[in-house]
């Protein structure tokens, strides 16, 4: 672990320590799956809704589809942000995160076992304090699992399309020190910022990483990935505990 004896984190955690994680199922009653996920002060509502039919490019394929949308409530941050729908344009960051969530969750489901049905994932950030996209992915997996259970109970899906759990966490270099699960105060001044998505089996789904006006070495990258792997293992354990498996 890269560490400086004089370095201390904003909230007093160890460098490889997650914030408190809480996953609450059944947060709302209308969707097939609904979860409130909390990474410290970051709180995201993740829902999974079932829609009959698939997009045109999937029609007559016999396969299902999973899509995702991400948004932040205006008061999710300290300074209110105008709703993007009212501004008439969805920001590039929002599109990027929506696509990331969709890709990550498609790695957790066998689309060939869904039939021609669509699962729509919606992640709405209620309160943002860093790690909103990683919290969204982690919570959305649990909502997805509940939605698939509903499909099975209805007899729509005879098999088990759900694959190994997928979770995500942020990791970065803060003042040259590798830190896991960055809150906003650390994320906003990190030298390097990574978002890592992994399966229960330790396989990578996606790695997003950038140097913020700096560079990083292969050794530092390996150190960050080791931290991320530890965090994802803990998150998968939290997902399974929430699902009672």
From Swiss-Prot:
Gene3D superfamilies noted in UniProt: GHMP Kinase, N-terminal domain (3.30.230.70)
Function, in words: Phosphorolytic 3'-5' exoribonuclease that plays an important role in tRNA 3'-end maturation. Removes nucleotide residues following the 3'-CCA terminus of tRNAs; can also add nucleotides to the ends of RNA molecules by using nucleoside diphosphates as substrates, but this may not be physiologically important. Probably plays a role in initiation of 16S rRNA degradation (leading to ribosome degradation) during starvation.
Protein name: Ribonuclease PH
Keyword set includes Acyltransferase: no
UniProt KW Transferase keyword: yes
Top-level EC class: transferase
A Gene Ontology biological process term: tRNA processing
Pfam families listed in its UniProt record: RNase_PH, RNase_PH_C
GO-annotated molecular function: 3'-5'-RNA exonuclease activity; tRNA binding; tRNA nucleotidyltransferase activity
Family: Belongs to the RNase PH family.
Record: residues binding phosphate: 93, 131-133
